Amino acid sequence: MNTTLIQYPAKIWYKLANYCLKSYQGLTQEPRVFLMRKLARFEIVRDWVAMLFNRSTKPREISRAKASVLGNLDVNAIAATIETDSCYQGLQLPQDVVQELLTFANSTVGYINRDLNRPWPCKGTEKVGVDLPENTRVCSYMSNIEKSSTVKKLEKDPGILAIAAKFLGAEAVHMGSEISWSFPVAGNVVQQREAAQVFHYDLDDYRFIKIFFYLTDVDMSSGPHAYIRGTHNGKKLKHQFMGTRCASINDEKILEYYGVQNVVDVCGKAGFGFVENPLCFHKGTEPTAKPRLMLQIEYAINDYGNIHEMLGY
C-alpha cells in the first residue's frame, strides 16, 4: 500500500484543523486584530476604511514639519512619493543622535533571533562562527528599547509624526519600535523566512507606516532593505487572499510577476532614513560580509495594543 497516499490527506486534515483552532483562538481572544488581519489584505477594504478615516478626521496643517530633529521636511512630497513608489528615501538623523543609539545598543542586552530565552549583550563586533552563539541570524533589543530616551524622543518627533499623519490621513498611533542587528550568517529558506529575509508584506492595520534608520553604514554586503516599487497596490488576487502567507512563495515567483526591474535596494550611511508603506513586498536581504543595525518606528490608524507581541514577532 502506498503510504504517501495515506499521509497526504492526513496532512491536509491536520493543517485544516490547526487553521480552524488558530482562527477560533484569534476570534475569541483578539477579535479586532483577527478581523483586521483577515480583511486588511484586500485592497478594496483598505481603501474603504481609509475613506472613512479621511472623512472623520479634522483637517490639519502639516505640510511642513517644524522643530524636527530631521530638519526641514516637505511632508506633502514625502507622502506623495510613498503613495506612488511605496517608499521614500532621504531622511537623515544627526550624527549625535546616531551615536546615542549606538551607545544604547552597545550597552543593552538584546535577544538572539527575538527569543526572550536567549539574552545576549550584542555589540555588532562579534565574529560570526567565533563570538556569536550558534544560529544567530538577528539580535533584537525587543522591549529593552523602552529604556532608550533617544528612541522615545524620535517616536514623538514633530517631523516623524507629521509624515505619519499625512500618509495615514489620521492621527498617528504609535504601534511599536525596534532596534535590531542582522548578521552575515547563511541560512536556508525557512531560516530566512523567520528572519523576514524573503519577500513578504505586513498586515498590522488597514493603513500603517514604518520609518527606518540605518545605525551602521549599509552597502550591498550589509543586508540592505529591499522593496518592490509600487506593490502596495495592484497585487495579484491570489496574493491578496494569501496575505502574510505570501512569505512562503519563492522570491523568484514574486519577481516573475511584479518585475525584477522594480526591486529597489536601499543603501546608505549611518543615520540614513526611509519611510515605507509595509503593504508593499519587501524584505531585509541577508548580509554577506558585515552586520547591519537598524531602527524602525511604526504608526497606524488604530490602537491594538502590542500587536507584535500578540502575533509572536
Language model features: what each stretch is:
Residues N2-L27, V45, A67-S68, H232-G243, ...:
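Non-heme Fe(II)/2-oxoglutarate
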Residues I179-F183, Y201, F213-D217, R229:
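Short, structured patches in soluble enzyme cores that scaffold and shape functional sites
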Residues S148-K153, Y258-V263, G284:
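Active-site rim elements
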Residues M220-C280, Y304:
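Double-stranded beta-helix
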Residues Q192-I209:
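Acidic, His- and aromatic-enriched active-site or binding-groove loops in soluble protein domains
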Residues D204-M220, C267-G268, E298-A300:
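Short, conserved beta-strand element in jelly-roll/cupin
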Residues N18-C20, V33-T84, G90-Q197:
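Non-heme Fe(II)-dependent double-stranded beta-helix
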